[in-house]
A protein has these predicted regions:
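Active-site- or binding-pocket-proximal scaffold segments within functional domains
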Residues: 1-313
Length: 313
């Protein structure tokens, strides 16, 4: 009887892939995964293919490709002979619009299940898009699809295109056992509102210092993004993800590192909006460490949280 194995999916952010020198936390985490009894699948970000470059960046065109690519991977692997579905643990990661794609993938799996046959992949997708509960239930009862659970969902600063329809975006899919979400405290681009989860005991959602790619990775200086990567590694390791010790040791998280300005160039003309930190939100301990080490760093949207510390007020 074979041991359990992990199926690991990574959906990268807009205009991100593994060809660039500066990689996001998605491929970094996948590359840190041990290879024994683990299979990794990577979906490059929307806008990386030539014909979807501009619409992918602006409107999120290409999300269907990411979702269906990952869905086909799961269908193939979960149906391989010698492996029962219960022996296979699913881990899904995503950044930016890739995080939104990862969340939609979870919604698809929860609604339609996994098809036994490759030709039913598109059917499962259409049932999800149409929210066709009757057909999904009927096809699972008749043995064309089967249900499964997702052990861990890890996302960095989820955003979506404003033209994308809503599919319970704020609610964690019931098939997901645990989710973690790292949110960018200092991102101010109006077209990049964070798509947070509603409060749930299964969701660990925290604010981190930095703009969008300081949190999700992609800048030459990984000081801040290594903080969130290490956090995500720790959270997923606790759920059974196996990682290379050398890759973890290579991280250099630094709360006092470079914090970039994303509100430059054409983004300035699209507007500015400071993200709201709610009273019940969790702010990661590294934010306080940055406030201590960088005297000029006092995020206005976290003023209520800062007031809890007399030495930072």
């Amino acid at each position: 009887m074979p041991r359990a194995r992990n199926l690991i999916i990574g959906c990268d952010g807009t205009w991100n892939d593994t060809a660039g020198i500066e990689r996001t936390n998605v491929p970094k985490l996948l590359n840190a995964c041990a290879t024994r009894h683990q299979i990794v699948h990577y979906e490059e970000g929307v806008g990386t293919a030539y014909l979807e470059a501009l619409p992918g960046g602006i409107y999120g065109k290409g999300l269907d490709r990411q979702i269906l690519g990952a869905y086909r991977f799961l269908r193939k692997r979960l149906n391989e002979s010698g492996w029962a579905s219960a022996q296979q643990n699913i881990f899904i990661f995503g950044f930016s619009r890739g995080a939104y794609a990862a969340r939609r993938l979870c919604g698809l799996i929860n609604h339609s299940g996994i098809p036994y046959r490759a030709r039913d992949v598109e059917l499962g997708w259409q049932m999800y898009l149409n929210q066709d509960v009757y057909s999904a239930s009927h096809l699972q009862t008749n043995g064309r699809f089967f249900s499964t659970t997702i052990k861990f969902l890890g996302v960095w600063d989820s955003v979506k295109s404003t033209i994308d329809p809503d599919y319970a975006d704020l609610t964690l899919s019931p098939c997901v056992r645990k989710a973690c979400h790292a949110m960018a405290l200092d991102e101010q681009r109006k077209p990049f509102p964070v798509l947070r989860f509603n409060a749930s005991q299964r969701v660990n959602q925290q604010w981190f210092s930095g703009v969008h790619s300081d949190v999700g990775g992609g800048y030459p200086e990984p000081d801040l993004s290594d903080i969130t990567l290490k956090w995500m590694i720790d959270q997923s390791w606790a759920e059974g993800l196996r990682l290379k010790a050398s890759a973890v040791r290579a991280l250099k998280p630094n709360p006092a590192g470079v914090l970039h300005n994303s509100l430059t160039g054409p983004w300035q003309s699209l507007g500015r909006k400071i993200r709201r930190v709610r009273k019940e939100d969790v702010v990661h301990e590294s934010v306080r460490a940055r406030c201590v080490e960088v005297a000029s760093y006092r995020p206005r949207n976290a003023s209520q949280w800062l007031n809890e510390f007399s030495d930072l007020a």
